[in-house]
Amino acid sequence: MIPLLLSLLAALVLTQAPAALADDLKEDSSEDRAFRVRIGAAQLRGVLGGALAIPCHVHHLRPPPSRRAAPGFPRVKWTFLSGDREVEVLVARGLRVKVNEAYRFRVALPAYPASLTDVSLVLSELRPNDSGVYRCEVQHGIDDSSDAVEVKVKGVVFLYREGSARYAFSFAGAQEACARIGARIATPEQLYAAYLGGYEQCDAGWLSDQTVRYPIQNPREACYGDMDGYPGVRNYGVVGPDDLYDVYCYAEDLNGELFLGAPPGKLTWEEARDYCLERGAQIASTGQLYAAWNGGLDRCSPGWLADGSVRYPIITPSQRCGGGLPGVKTLFLFPNQTGFPSKQNRFNVYCFRDSAHPSAFSEASSPASDGLEAIVTVTEKLEELQLPQEAVESESRGAIYSIPITEDGGGGSSTPEDPAEAPRTPLESETQSVAPPTGSSEEEGEALEEEERFKDTETPKEEKEQENLWVWPTELSSPLPTGLETEHSLSQVSPPAQAVLQVGASPSPRPPRVHGPTVETLQPPGEGSLTSTPDGAREVGGETGSPELSGVPREREEAGSSSLEDGPSLLPETWAPVGTREVETPSEEKSGRTVLTGTSVQAQPVLPTDSASRGGVAVAPSSGDCIPSPCHNGGTCLEEKEGFRCLCVPGYGGDLCDVGLHFCSPGWEPFQGACYKHFSTRRSWEEAESQCRALGAHLTSICTPEEQDFVNDRYREYQWIGLNDRTIEGDFLWSDGPPLLYENWNPGQPDSYFLSGENCVVMVWHDQGQWSDVPCNYHLSYTCKMGLVSCGPPPQLPLAQIFGRPRLRYAVDTVLRYRCRDGLAQRNLPLIRCQENGLWEAPQISCVPRRPARALRSMTAPEGPRGQLPRQRKALLTPPSSL
């Protein structure tokens, strides 16, 4: 028994010896150490864009050595550790300091070397990527010591817009929107700090100082940075408080608990609201979700939020969740980042419960990827270029299209679109069929080029890949801004055909576009317009009115002839005969050339034709009755002996031109004999002009100061006008043909800056609408203009055809030329003119068979007796009846 006890005692002594020996060695080491570095905190929190002091003090364990024993200053080194990276921030010895270039002007040792025991670091302009571990090391002689602390930078900047439209907030509305989602409007310093941390967003948004900016990491043709070709925060400067933009919001603290609710079958928006209320919570706001993501929340499950959006936070992205970048992902209906899912679709929900412990979120929720097969992001770049420095640039753009794919088909989907703002990246080769869930409609769409990039807090990363996409149920509609009545709804998609039926709805500042070769769109209750267009994506008009069916392709004008022999006319083949009108035939004919004679000139006194509205004669009480002009609607006042007379522009009549004889089409606005329609969709000058021509119009021409004020005040955007010098440098012409009778150039314009191809003209609305010449490939909004009176397609003749491609409408005084078919000879005048009453002149051309060469030689025979012509020649010169 005793030997057993002795052996156990010996074993116990042996096991305790190493620990005791280690403690003795540690105690001896501490006694030998001259000093110890202490930070005194396990974690520090800083605010985005602010400054943070990281304390670090040197505690001497024995009296410090004399200067003779340890000459010089201690060496101080601060190091940043994040993952596997270790970066020197600062190294200092006395007055000699070496700072890493990435931290230049941002770090300092405020007390050192005046105090050798205080080596605290101050880090300013905090960025999101400043979060990590900071290590403080001090070395003096042969002694050294170090300590570390974790730093967390809280606060996140994100772009916010409501689902109805882009650029919908005034400055006051932007502040209210951020407050409504549990955030506040960001400051310029916060946005700049987010940019320095890698944030990029190609959308112009309000900031707290009433400026409009957006951050760009990779300048490109779609989005420029601080300067031409350089990254930075693009700054529009201080703009008017009533201008409309998106807003950059800032969220910081989450004063409560945010958790994911994922019941079986998922929830509609109203069911999601009730789900949170039953658990003593409420639907989380967008700002709260961003704050939770900034605090570490990672959920690969789209869920409802209070504003009707569907989002999910990703910290660790993967191919099936988030693409390749972290951030809060948002599901949109349309490529221009608008349209939230229908509230009848089913998703999970993010709930928020107030708590006494801030910055807490539930980790005990259901699995992160419950029921989620994949999250696919489909993106197409929307091109937008900046304006030169003199004319503040146009709004920037982005394009993000996120579609969840679920097993039960209830996760929602979307209608693919082809953004007209990016015509330079055709992707017709990347097409595939879309597989719909059970019970939903079928659609054959076009898969856009994919980028693994979402709406928020990440840098774009392109990756071409095709995926199968679900289609949104037919109940979905495109949300419209407040005050707009009707909605667009999609129905069944037909098999491949050659037309796209499109429906116009109530006027929208940015009308949606439906893409696909065969999309059938149902018209909502009320009036609308229905147009048949060729295969391809076309813009849905926003006008309302009685239905109008047209079969003429809306294509660009092309040189060449188009036969009018076959096919019925779109208008009745009747016209009012008005007799022969002599028109000078151009010496050099050009196929498809339209000759305009200035119908858009309102103030120019032009003698009316027989069919024009002359107006009456009013008795003048005294001279000078034309100042101010009593004539309405752009009429010209002429003083006469017995009074004055008003010459009315086409479409108006009456003594004072106050009687409307013609009216603009639905969706077009009248002014002084012309109709105008504004498009907020950004296009290059050539694309905008082509779109206007497809509508039977042109980019607006400005012929009077009154017209300048109308266009600039009515449509308060940077916009193209029809003026250009694309043909001859310095020779500016209007695209619709009238002479240049009025100018409103900015000082120093046009300048064709360094011959950089500034051949098109933009109206800068905030500078009283003054004009500047800019490159034609900028993407701006535009206004189309057509005459109040116009003619339809020209009369069809069986043996003749019109030069050029027929159009839907022709302006008054447009002159067209017929030519006879091959083998026929032309007789009589081949020209017709569009009259002021909207009818074409009666064609006078006659086409007869050509005579053989022998018959032509006989025509040159000498005259017969008494000066008479040969009978055969006389018969040939007898004009035939009109064909």
UniProtKB/Swiss-Prot annotation:
GO terms, biological process: cell-matrix adhesion; central nervous system development; gliogenesis; hippocampus development; neuron projection extension; regulation of neuronal synaptic plasticity; skeletal system development; synapse maturation
Q: Which residues form the signal peptide?
A: 1-22
A Pfam family it matches? V-set
Name the cystine pairs.
Answer: C56-C136, C178-C249, C202-C223, C276-C351, C300-C321, C626-C637, C631-C646, C648-C657, C692-C784, C760-C776, C791-C834, C820-C847
Glycosylated position list: N129, N336, S413
Q: Could you tell me which residue ranges the C-type lectin domain spans? A: 658-786
Give all residue intervals belonging to the EGF-like domain.
Answer: 622-658
**Domain Ig-like V-type, chain residue ranges per copy:** 35-154
Ranges of biased composition (kind: Acidic residues): 441-451
Alphabetized UniProt keyword annotations: Disulfide bond, EGF-like domain, Extracellular matrix, Glycoprotein, GPI-anchor, Hyaluronic acid, Immunoglobulin domain, Lectin, Lipoprotein, Membrane, Phosphoprotein, Proteoglycan, Repeat, Secreted, Signal, Sushi
Segments of skewed composition (Basic and acidic residues): 452-467
Report the residue ranges that make up the Link domain in this protein. Answer: 156-251, 256-353
Localization (cell): Secreted
Residue ranges of the Sushi domain? 789-849
Q: Where is this region: Disordered?
A: 389-574, 859-883
Q: Main localization of the protein? A: secreted
Residue(s) carrying Phosphoserine: S413
Which regions are flagged for Polar residues bias?
Answer: 428-440
Q: From the Swiss-Prot or TrEMBL record, what is one GO molecular function term? A: carbohydrate binding
Q: Which GO CC annotations does the UniProt entry carry?
A: axon; axon initial segment; cell surface; dendrite; extracellular matrix; extracellular space; GABA-ergic synapse; glutamatergic synapse
Free-text tissue specificity from the UniProt record: Brain.
As for PTM, the annotation reads: O-glycosylated; contains chondroitin sulfate.
Q: Spell out the family assignment given in the record's similarity comment.
A: Belongs to the aggrecan/versican proteoglycan family.
Can you state the subunit structure given in the record?
A: Interacts with TNR.
This molecule's function is given as: May play a role in the terminally differentiating and the adult nervous system during postnatal development. Could stabilize interactions between hyaluronan (HA) and brain proteoglycans. Isoform 2 may function as a chondroitin sulfate-bearing cell surface receptor.
- Write the protein's name: Brevican core protein
Species this chain originates from: Rattus norvegicus
Primary gene name: Bcan
